[in-house]
Amino acid sequence: MELAPLFNQMPFARLLGIEVTEATEGTATARLEHSDDLLSNPTGEVAHGGATYALADTAGGAAVMSLAGIVTPTIDMRIDYLSPATDDLVADAELVRYGDSVAVVRVEIHDVDGTHVATAHGTYKTSGQGEETPWGEDSEVGDKVPDDLR
C-alpha cells in the first residue's frame, strides 16, 4: 500500500498543510510549511504547538501504518518542545517497537535549517480495528515487522 498519497488525502492533514513524503518499513517523513494560519498569536512568528504536535502524530501514524497495513489510531502522544517553530518543519518518525496490540514510535521534528524543534513519543493501536469500529477492518501484518521490533 502506498501510504504517502493516502495520508495526503486526509482532511485534517490537508487543512494544516501536512505532507507525508515517505512512509516505508517502519519509518516516515512528513513536512509542514510555516504559514500565518499556524501562528500561536497574531503578532508573532512562532507556530502554535498544536501544529507541531499534529505533524508528529501524522508522521508517527504513517510509520506504524507502513508495517501494519491498517489504520492505527493514536493511543497516546507525548511531546517535548525544544525550540520555537518559526520556519518550515520536517518530522522523521521511526518505529521503536511493534507489539501484538500497540506500537511505539519516536519522532524528531527539525526546522529546515536543522534546528531541533521537538521530540515526540507516540503509542498506536495495532489490533482490534474490526468492522464495527470507525477505523475499518483488520488485516494481517504477516512477516512485515522485523524481529528486532517485536
Name each model feature, range by range.
Residues 35-39, 59-60, 85:
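Short, charged/polar surface micro-motifs in flexible loops or helix N-caps
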Residues 86, 96-150:
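HotDog/MaoC-like acyl-thioester-processing domains
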